[in-house]
Amino acid sequence: MAQLNFGGTVENVVIRDEFPLEKAREVLKNETIAVIGYGVQGPGQALNLRDNGFNVIVGQRQGKTYDKAVADGWVPGETLFGIEEACEKGTIIMCLLSDAAVMSVWPTIKPYLTVAA
């Protein structure tokens, strides 16, 4: 583990040698990662996870960014869903919505969050 200084705060950070990609794939092999939001952060993170062999779905409401998700290869009803359905299907939920969007969507997401074991 490395200790890194982020603006005066020292953090312990797991490095790649300690947790390589193959180990991450093994740990997450039975998980479905639901990326909620396909605006600024969603595409990069969802595509990176998918390209690295993780089981990923996207939750996005209809509109321009939904169409972008389709253009990026996400398949409606298979890997692309509305927000609530993606939360229901995901075992890990990554909320990548803007702060403003989270405020309006939070009541939809909250029931699907659980305390990790």
Protein language model annotation of sequence segments:
Residues 61, 74-117:
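Rossmann-like NAD(P)-binding element
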